[in-house]
A protein has these predicted regions:
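Conserved cytochrome P450 K-helix E-x-x-R motif and the immediately C-terminal K′/meander segment
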Residues: 46-87, 106, 113
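Central I-helix of cytochrome P450 enzymes
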Residues: 1-34, 63, 90-98, 135, ...
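Cytochrome P450 heme-thiolate "Cys pocket" and heme-binding signature region
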Residues: 123-154, 179-184
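Cytochrome P450 heme-binding "Cys pocket" and the immediately downstream C-terminal segment
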Residues: 25-27, 147-187
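Conserved cytochrome P450 K-helix/beta-meander segment immediately N-terminal to the heme-binding cysteine loop
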Residues: 67, 97-125
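Conserved cytochrome P450 catalytic core segment spanning the I/J/K helices
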Residues: 1-14, 42, 46-49, 53, ...
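Conserved beta-strand elements of beta-rich interaction domains across eukaryotes
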Residues: 9, 94, 101-103, 122, ...
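C-terminal helix/juxtamembrane-tail motif
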Residues: 167, 186-204
Length: 204
């Protein structure tokens, strides 16, 4: 079911984005300032607003780099024997691509464990299958067909959450208390729930 697959992964990505933002207050402040400067006193940001939010888009790319929807891409079967990076792969071998490792490769990414949306601001790298260092949705003929829906949904959800609310940790918690453990499964969900306090902006 393509709709179920799209909503499940988008929900997981939204939680990971908010997790990363709460753990990185500098990024939270910067992306909220951008969103609120564009949104002003609007009740709801739409697609016309989203195109004016480059830092939000960079933040989403960085979220998908570190916390991609699925660590392993859809498996392939080799049609014939081949050599991949010096390794012999016999015909009829099931091959998995570990996107998690690719997207944290220190030979490709500077400080790969750091959540830094700025790395995408002056970069043409995108997650639509043309740049193999960033493939959270796969690549080639079997790339995820729901990329456009996932991208727009993520952008709208996060833009409006950040525009309309201020976010705080529950009393007694600090950002170091938030873990990034993952539940086992096809979709990479956060193991422990993210609990935040949302405060409505009074002047909206």
């Amino acid at each position: 079911n393509i709709l179920a697959a799209g909503t499940d992964t988008t929900a997981a990505a939204s939680v990971w984005a908010m997790t990363a933002l709460v753990k990185n207050p500098r990024v939270m402040k910067k992306v909220q300032e951008e969103v609120r400067n564009v949104g002003g006193t609007k009740d709801f940001l739409d697609e016309d607003d989203i195109i004016k939010l480059p830092y939000l888009k960079a933040m989403i790319k960085e979220t998908l780099r570190l916390y991609l929807p699925s660590q392993l891409l859809v498996p392939r079967e080799s049609n014939e024997e081949c050599i991949v990076d010096g390794y012999r792969v016999p015909a009829k071998t099931i091959v998995y691509v570990n996107a998690w490792v690719i997207q944290r490769d220190p030979e490709v990414w500077k400080n790969p464990e750091e959540f830094c949306p700025e790395r995408f601001l002056d970069s043409a790298i995108d997650f639509r299958g043309q740049d193999f260092e960033l493939i959270p949705f796969g690549a080639g003929r079997r790339i995820c067909p729901g990329i456009p829906m996932a991208a727009v949904t993520l952008e709208l959800v996060l833009a409006n959450l950040l525009h309309s609310f201020d976010w705080e940790l529950p009393q007694g918690m600090v950002k170091e208390d938030i873990d990034v453990e993952v539940l086992p499964g096809i979709t990479q969900h956060k193991k422990n729930h993210l609990c935040l306090c949302a405060k409505t902006r009074s002047h909206i």
